[in-house]
């Protein structure tokens, strides 16, 4: 299947939402869903749903709705959720520990396979209650040998983010989910997504203030 190469980032960011909604519809034994139903479930307008879906070819027929099981499988495929994706985590501070305790594999086919921190961190050498080993960062290349891990979650102080990113890239990591409020300098072939909790909270507060006027 050939997709439009100019898919907007806003559309791409909604793909996981569509996948989640179709999984929910499927669990509720809903076989067909209209663009209006999908839009209401996500909190957008139906025109946006139809426009988003148009980038991926013919996903449904006007007046007939969308086949829930078919679309659930479609989004699982393009989001690579048909087989388990192992990821690693660097930084076992407060955010890192919270993510280690979040059981991704129970909700999606993602699993934190190992975690890393500075070699002198007291947690190095330990294993979490879910069996995730914690290693010193200097051993990352060695630990990745023979694994399929190409994705990393980065939860380190901003001042260390680029340095650690360089270590990850040198070890063969191709994708980084960064919780540090900095923009990483990355070589071609390596991609990053950023989670800035402060920015998201400030945006929320802005919208809350707008509602008061």
Swiss-Prot record:
Residues binding NAD(+), per UniProt: 91-96
GO biological process, one term: negative regulation of DNA-templated transcription
Annotated region of DNA binding: 17-56
InterPro entries: CoA-bd (IPR003781), NAD(P)-bd_dom_sf (IPR036291), Rex_DNA-bd_C_dom (IPR009718), Tscrpt_rep_Rex (IPR022876), WH-like_DNA-bd_sf (IPR036388), WH_DNA-bd_sf (IPR036390)
Listed GO MF terms: DNA binding; DNA-binding transcription factor activity
SMART domains, alphabetized: CoA_binding
Subcellular location: Cytoplasm
GO annotation, cellular component aspect: cytoplasm
Keywords of the record: Cytoplasm, DNA-binding, NAD, Repressor, Transcription, Transcription regulation
Quaternary structure and partners: Homodimer.
Family: Belongs to the transcriptional regulatory Rex family.
Function description: Modulates transcription in response to changes in cellular NADH/NAD(+) redox state.
Protein name per Swiss-Prot or TrEMBL: Redox-sensing transcriptional repressor Rex
Organism listed in the record: Streptococcus mutans serotype c (strain ATCC 700610 / UA159)
Gene: rex
């Amino acid at each position: 299947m050939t997709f439009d190469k100019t898919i907007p980032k806003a559309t791409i960011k909604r793909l996981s939402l569509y996948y989640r909604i179709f999984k929910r519809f499927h669990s509720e034994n809903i076989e067909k869903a209209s663009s209006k139903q999908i839009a209401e479930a996500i909190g957008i307008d139906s025109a946006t749903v139809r426009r988003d879906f148009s980038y991926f070819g013919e996903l449904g027929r006007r007046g007939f709705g969308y086949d829930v099981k078919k679309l659930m499988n479609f989004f699982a495929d393009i989001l690579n959720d048909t087989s388990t994706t192992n990821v690693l985590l660097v930084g076992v501070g407060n955010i890192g520990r919270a993510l280690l305790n979040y059981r991704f594999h129970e909700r999606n086919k993602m699993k934190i396979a190992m975690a890393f921190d500075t070699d002198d961190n007291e947690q190095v050498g330990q294993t979490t209650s879910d069996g995730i080993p914690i290693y010193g960062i200097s051993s990352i290349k060695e630990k990745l040998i023979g694994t399929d891990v190409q994705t990393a979650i980065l939860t380190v102080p901003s001042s260390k983010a680029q340095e650690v990113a360089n270590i990850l890239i040198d070890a063969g990591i191709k994708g980084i989910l960064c919780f540090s409020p900095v923009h990483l300098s990355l070589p071609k072939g390596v991609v990053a997504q950023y989670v800035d909790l402060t920015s998201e909270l400030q945006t929320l507060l802005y919208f809350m203030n707008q509602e008061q006027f």
